[in-house]
Amino acid sequence: MMMHMAETRTRPAPMMAASLQMVTADMIAAAAKRAEQRIAPLWPLRNFVAVNPYLGLLDYSFETAAELLARRAGARTTAPRAFYAQAIRDGRITDADLASALAEGSPSPGAPATVEALKAFALSNAPEPTFTTLPTVADVAREITGVNWADIVTDSISAWAGAYFDLGQSYWRSPWKPMSAYAAWRAEATYDRTPHIRGAQGFHQALRELPESAMETIIAAVEMLHIPADGLEAYLHRLLLTIHGWAGYARYLRWEAELYGGADHTLTDLLAIRLVWEVALWRSFASRGMAEAWRTRSHELVGDQLDAALQRAIAGDLLLQRAFEKAYQRQLFACLGTPKPVKHATRKRAQAAFCIDVRSEIFRRALETVTDEIETIGFAGFFGFPIEYVPLAETRGGAQCPVLLTPQFVIAESVGGASETEVTAVIEKRALNQRVAKVWRMFKFGPVSCFGFVGPVGLAYVRKLLLDTLGITRPVPHPATFGLDARTRERVKPSLEPRAIGGRTTGMSPEQRVNVAEGALKAMSLTSNFARLVLLAGHGSTTVNNPHATGLDCGACGGHTGEANVRVAVQILNDPAARTGLKARGIVIPDDTVFVAGLHDTTTDDVTIFDKNDIPASHADDLRRLEADLAAAGRLARAERAALLKIDPKGNIDGAVRQRSRDWSQVRPEWGLAGCAAFIAAPRDRTAGAKLDGRSFLHNYDWRQDEGFGVLELIMTAPMIVASWINLQYYGSTVDNRVFGSGNKTLHNVVGTLGVLEGNSGDLRVGLPWQSVHDGERYVHEPMRLHVMIEAPIEAMTAIIARHEQVRQLLDNGWLYLFALDERGKVTHTYAGGLRWEAC
């Protein structure tokens, strides 16, 4: 089965005479734009959503991108060879898998061409390849002086960026923050003598010579450094990768601006800053042969290719990676081919819809084991309600939808059953509590006042320190409830009624409510056969002392929990007026059907039901039975996860799991989406009973109910893309945590509340901590590309692929696999690239 044809792969251009052509300003500007597009965005910690680290390289094949990243970032794109060797020894990778991988073609001439040769390549003790990255002036300066100028430059830019981009962590605001990034950096650099002291005597001369405009600086610097035409994009991309994390954050700022129809030039500013340093070092060491050394090394930029030996090594590793994925495919196909028969009742006692998140698969399977009277459903965790949720006392909120989308509605938090006067009083009280807490925090952590705090006040914190350590209290209040008393917290809920907040109108009109409800139900393939209780369960996590906590929340909710979405959805779906509107559109919800909002805690596998007072007494027994079933399913799910968490199966599993969620020293409170490997869009019947080990995104989809295939198109352009982002984030963080991950969690220091450094210097780190993918002994996340399996007519899928460039790039260039399922859940065809399919 071929994912794509070898001959369609894009390869870097060879060295050509064009490299000697005149480099124009337009060429430089275009190359800068392309280099900037190669950088993947990095979301801040407040909503740390998973991002495909290879996002800017989708126009290359997976194999070509591996070579390009080795050259420009010194990055690996496969696991260490010993990983595949062990899989061969253990029998996970068979000779048939190796043969199947070879049958799809070699990524490079000279790579192992037979099963025996590939196996020998894997099992040999030959050293792993060492990549020599494309040169920068900072690299050449290190060769000339023996001083690590590359690290000095990165540290300097990072220290400045941490202050400039700070989102509220620092108490001393940068005086240049209102200026553009490049203007602010120039203003500060004028007074900074550090480069001069470190030996870059030409730094301030370069600063004076170069223009005040970022793009003009880029053009002037490239011209000064005589970068060859064929090496422009490679060189500029290489520079951005030396400040990968901060470039990623700047790319996020551009992403957000463009999503809302605006523009942002911060990434261009950062590229200009990095180029100023290049010119400064080039000038500073002119007397030590820099010009000649750089002239010689800069020719390496042309062609952007590895030597033949490294190409062969990478090609061999890519073949082993492909064989490893073939081994998983065998296992997955067999699992789907023998599903457990589903018992269909006339009407289910309850239906429970969960996010497609792989962690939900274990819980759904556990719930179906507890009772066959509950039908489970999988859908993106925002449940089709793309909202911005504004907390009490705030004027802006977070986007509770995938980052590919923009919120369509603004929903404000309110106090249930309260008058407008009471709501205003609660808002004012919360705002006051927040201001007081901020002043107190400034006193505790201020550079002078902290000494006064530790002496007279510090002893009063002994009790809290002890309680925090025991997991009885949180080290810091949860931001969702901070500033509210216990009684008010129980009454806080979303309000659908129109209100004016911050110059904007919140809420949803009656027609909007019907429209969004219709879209959500159709996308879930839930338009008939409603149970008496229908649970919509968003998900979130419970951890403490975890900067990346939002990365464990719902990616489909923009890095927030799904609580707001399900509570809004349930309010609308229980509204008689909305049901009347739905009935007119052919969706009849029985009068005795009640929708219930819940939240699945993926750390503890507890499910919380919201707004119980709104559930009619007629359904009290239904609710009691549902909660009992959810509790039983939680126990089963915790028992299954216990092995990965290394919890004694004979001990108190429930207590141990909950303790981890409150332990501020715990680096692995849960495994998140580690292991994610498949995305399945089909009726639940096709996967029910199959033990998918919490590795599959499960999306309910029945193409027979999808007239015009609008839902299929939505699945392939939103949830499938988001799942691939998650999968490739875990992939990159596993195969090369140095480049695509965030390193050792125990060394993290939060900077500006937006990201982390590893230690107290260096670049802003991207991706996941090492502890999120490795347990200290082995990989918990096994790196492999996502296997997408959809039950739908091939013609419909092909038409969608043809219409959407990003979907086609992902598939044609081998960034994920796509398989077609039949009505029995068996794989019948695989997408082979170029809008072609092959029978399995």
From Swiss-Prot:
Pfam family, one: DabA
Alphabetical UniProt keywords: Cell membrane, Membrane, Metal-binding, Transport, Zinc
Binding-site positions, Zn(2+): C355, D357, H539, C554
Gene: dabA
Location, primary (coarse class): membrane
Subunit structure as annotated in this protein's UniProt entry: Forms a complex with DabB.
Protein name, as recorded: Probable inorganic carbon transporter subunit DabA
Function (record text): Part of an energy-coupled inorganic carbon pump.
Gene Ontology cellular component terms for the protein in this record: plasma membrane
Bilayer disposition of the protein: Peripheral membrane protein
Cofactor(s) named in the record: Zn(2+)
Superkingdom, taxonomy of origin: Bacteria
Keyword ATP-binding carried by entry: no
Keyword Transport in annotation: yes
Subcellular location: Cell membrane
Molecular function (Gene Ontology), one example: zinc ion binding
Species of origin: Roseiflexus castenholzii (strain DSM 13941 / HLO8)
Family: Belongs to the inorganic carbon transporter (TC 9.A.2) DabA family.
